[in-house]
Amino acid sequence: MTLPVERVALDLLEADMYPEDWNEFSKFIHLSKYSRWNDENKKRESWAETVDRWWDWLSAKASANGLEGLDLSIKDMVYQRDVMPSMRSLMTAGPAADRDNVCIFNCSYLDLDSPVALAELLYVLMNGTGVGYSV
């Protein structure tokens, strides 16, 4: 049986998971932060699969809000790492972001002026989003 740490090490060695210009640190960050486990293939997503998952989620959200035909060059630029979307959206795109879009935000701010605001602060923090506040 392959342990999870060994599986990550094996995934790092797979040449077809990443574009040729990626260094080992970039591969590790992708695997540890943004790549999702694929039960069907018994391995983590490649960079292309991560970008596809993000793009499919973004396209579905855009279509649901009347924005058809997103420019595919955006997806290509993300794949080439010429531009990057919110890394939180890259990490959580799919069912997690569909359940609650708070998880896609990098940070937020809240005026902590009531018990309700404190509850909101805790909720946002539990979704993994940083919160700045004032009292």
Predicted regions located by residue number:
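Extended catalytic cores of very large enzyme megasubunits
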Residues: 1-135
